[in-house]
Amino acid sequence: MKTPFTILAALTVATTLADVPDEWDIIELSFGEPTSVDSGEIKFAMCPKTECPNVESEEEFKAAIKAKRAKGKKVLLSIGGQNGQVQLKTTEARDKFVSSVGGIIDKYGLDGLDIDFEGHSLYLDQGDTDFKNPKTSVVVNLIAALKSLKEKYGKAFVLTMAPETFFVQLGYSSYGPSNGNDARAGSYLPVIHAMRDDLTVLQVQNYNSGPIIGLDDQYHNVGTPDFLIAMADMLKAGFPVAKTNNTFPPLREDQIAIGLPSTVSAGNGFVDEKGVQDALNCLMKGESCGTYKPRGGKSPSFRGLMAWSINWDKFSNWGFLNPHRKYLDSFP
């Protein structure tokens, strides 16, 4: 059975959940943040009334989550973001992460978790060169924590990840601190690889990124269909990490979504409606491709799109959601 096309998006608590259109399939509540960088304890709070006069009460919020889930939508807790650095350096922090995240999921009746670790949350120690057998504590402990949560909640647990390109596709040319490189380069790869059998969607942020080398060994820049195609194709085709003989295996096409800013103001790398749909046509049908030709073949079951964010799109009168929902729904 074919996986339905999906449109995902982050929702900050400044926007009322009950008012989110049902065309969004997966809603990621942003953000759960740590009490300190290395505590492992995650907190999630409603927007203060001083900032959000129309914010729901906690009971209204829980009811809205229940109503969305009753319609088949998935509501997740998104952890991290630009300001939410999380470093699970110790087993104590790992265990606190598991217990606190589980507590939030249980309290609100959520479907799962989105990992949006940015900044210096993940990195690789010197000598940690094999993504299949990581040694760095912040990586090893995150993997163990995610496996514990998956085991606790079972098959229905939804797990998504929203890394930046620096932590994923950059791993084709640079991995970890070897040769004087940034220790964070490619550091999501061991997490993705370890969780690939349990990963629902990988939605790499195709914005706020520097140029990235694709499988054609050419630099690609944000804001173009070629960038979207090249970055998604690396995940579908797989790639040799740091150009060695250690290959990151392909993900299933239904695990891959393209992360985009929903408006020009939401992030550097906005792509207009035609550009996004040209990229999807190329990936799914092998049509409308630009200079980059996918190595991974056609992906008719490609998962869809992720937007940052519902809030931004609301202020643009759903300029992202409406045309792309219609486009994806036009496929059989």
UniProtKB/Swiss-Prot annotation:
It is found in: Secreted. Residues 1-18 form the signal peptide. It catalyses: Random endo-hydrolysis of N-acetyl-beta-D-glucosaminide (1->4)-beta-linkages in chitin and chitodextrins. It comes from Arthroderma benhamiae (strain ATCC MYA-4681 / CBS 112371). It comes from the Eukaryota. This is Probable class II chitinase ARB_00204. Pfam families: Glyco_hydro_18 (PF00704). It is an enzyme of class 3 (hydrolase). Its EC number is 3.2.1.14. Belongs to the glycosyl hydrolase 18 family. Chitinase class II subfamily. Degrades chitin and chitotriose. PROSITE patterns: GH18_1 (PS01095), GH18_2 (PS51910).
